Amino acid sequence: RHSCVRLDRMISDLLMLIKAQEPVTASEANRCDLFSQVSGAVDDLAGAARDAGVQVRVGGKSPVMIHGEADQIRMAVRKMVENAIVYSHPGGAVGVSVALSPDGKNAVVRVIDHGEGVPKADLPRIFERFYRGSNQNERTADGIGLGLAIVKHAALAHHGDVTVWSAPGQGSTFTLSLPVGD
């Protein structure tokens, strides 16, 4: 049963990666509230957070309108939060925030954890397809290295960007920036 679930997840991640590589054209039909997508992604992971003993908090204001495929945005945020949960210590907390950039041109989602952090040697490759960092553990054993690649390609398809700051033992901050909708 575990193998079937893992295979299903791999196939799902591969399909998401393929879809995330298709450019998104801004239109009135694909305007969505980023805060709603972020809140939905966090709600989707409530059980996983509870099982890991990690508290996830969302902050920001609504609406923050962007042009984009709502499902792709939600999945990208979900992958960021899922990683933060998995790499956090039991009893830890993950902070998720939605805000506008200082110039007001971008919507910014930040996912902050105080977990293991990413080893410096892994940082240049962390968004590559199938790349798995050197800090794997029993909670990360089922991953195949597509989660952050999905985030990167979803960001690029939406004319945005994703960055990471991390220090071993201090945690990580992943920042997804997307152009705001007019």
Where are these regions (language model features)?
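Short conserved segment of the HATPase_c
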Residues: V118-F130
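A conserved beta-strand-to-alpha-helix junction within the catalytic ATP-binding
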Residues: E28-D43, L100
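Short alpha-helical segment of the dimerization/phosphotransfer core of two-component systems
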Residues: H2-L7
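Conserved catalytic submotifs in the C-terminal HATPase_c
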Residues: E28-R31, R50, Q55-V64
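Conserved glycine-rich
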Residues: H159-G160
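Conserved micro-motifs of the catalytic ATP-binding
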Residues: E22-S27, M65-G68
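Short helix-loop "hinge" at the ATP-lid/N-box region of the Bergerat-fold HATPase_c
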Residues: A84-I85
